[in-house]
Amino acid sequence: MSIKPIEYRDGVVRMIDQRLLPTQELWLEYRDYQAVAEAILTMVVRGAPAIGVAAAYGAALGARDIEADSFESFLAALKNVCDTLAATRPTAVNLFWALERMQAKARELAALPLDAIKAALMDEAQAIAAQDDAINRAMGRHGAELIADNARVLTHCNAGALATGGYGTALGVIRAAVESGKKISVLADETRPFLQGSRLTAWELHKDGIPVTLICDNMAGALMRQGEIDCVIVGADRIAANGDVANKIGTYSVAVLAKEHGLPFYVAAPLSTIDLKIPDGDHIPIEERDTSEVTHCGPTRLAPEGINVRNPAFDVTPAGLITAIITERGVVRGDYVRGLANLF
């Protein structure tokens, strides 16, 4: 059974600290929005859908603590809360989607007493979390039809239960295929520099009893050439209107390799990851993270001091390299501009 990385209980938001996995399973408690923002920024929680769920809970915690004498002042304070949460990570559009949904819910309830609005916002955050799990399962059912029995599936980064409200996007498709009776084995790229593949994907799949083999990022091409991979499936942090996909750094390289070797390259993502306001991948903001993630592994330095370092957290895979985009409302192929727009 897949883990849920975010919980709400008795006024407290709890998150598993994904930075410590797989060696330590530590749950942290959050009682205010500033702490939730820090958790998103420092990657206690990560993965676009999970970030959206965490942000919704953060907005609800922030709303709970607002002292206001009018709806207008409450809404202004809620916007400040949401602005703080929105400033944490720029690429994952689910973050902004969830925060806008929370503010829209507040505006919808303008006629109610403020205490009732605050309670409704916590209910809305819980609804976002529950709906994300249901969305992932629907996506899994659609995507499972694309995965053949006995398939050897390569995935990059972690698009599993840990990256969502539960079940997973790319790993949700794999889980659904296994649940349908198919024999599936997974190859997980380690995913430098944050090692989400080795620390998180391998941990999740192993915990669920799904066969998984960990590989270094630079092994993928050789294994494709040797016929050891049948298809690739990844998640997404933002999908532009034309089907270009921003995902964890290294995804583009895997897509190029898949194209060269004639392998299907699938992207699994909910509608909340699709940003029709962004025309193409060139307009997606790409987060640059601290260089220490590249120069260090934990406390151990791996590179000389003073060296120049780049650490973009994401890259963009052009739509032309993508075989299909799997969503909770079905699978889109070919004309992504029309196909993605028709989902809404």
From Swiss-Prot:
Catalytic machinery residues: 237
Q: What keywords were assigned to this record?
A: Amino-acid biosynthesis, Isomerase, Methionine biosynthesis
Q: What GO MF annotations does this protein's record show?
A: S-methyl-5-thioribose-1-phosphate isomerase activity
Pathway listed for it is:
Amino-acid biosynthesis; L-methionine biosynthesis via salvage pathway; L-methionine from S-methyl-5-thio-alpha-D-ribose 1-phosphate: step 1/6
Q: Could you tell me what reaction this enzyme catalyses? A: 5-(methylsulfanyl)-alpha-D-ribose 1-phosphate = 5-(methylsulfanyl)-D-ribulose 1-phosphate
Q: Which domain of life is it from?
A: Bacteria
User: What EC number(s) are associated with this protein in UniProt?
Assistant: 5.3.1.23
Provide the transmembrane region boundaries. none
Q: Where does substrate bind?
A: 46-48, 89, 196, 247-248
Q: Where is this site: Transition state stabilizer?
A: 157
The alphabetized list of GO BP terms reads: L-methionine salvage from methylthioadenosine
Give the Pfam families listed for this entry.
IF-2B
What is the protein's known function? Catalyzes the interconversion of methylthioribose-1-phosphate (MTR-1-P) into methylthioribulose-1-phosphate (MTRu-1-P).
Q: Which family does it belong to?
A: Belongs to the eIF-2B alpha/beta/delta subunits family. MtnA subfamily.
Q: Which PANTHER family match?
A: METHYLTHIORIBOSE-1-PHOSPHATE ISOMERASE
Its recorded name reads Methylthioribose-1-phosphate isomerase
Print the organism lineage: Bacteria, Pseudomonadati, Thermodesulfobacteriota, Desulfuromonadia, Desulfuromonadales
Encoding gene (name): mtnA
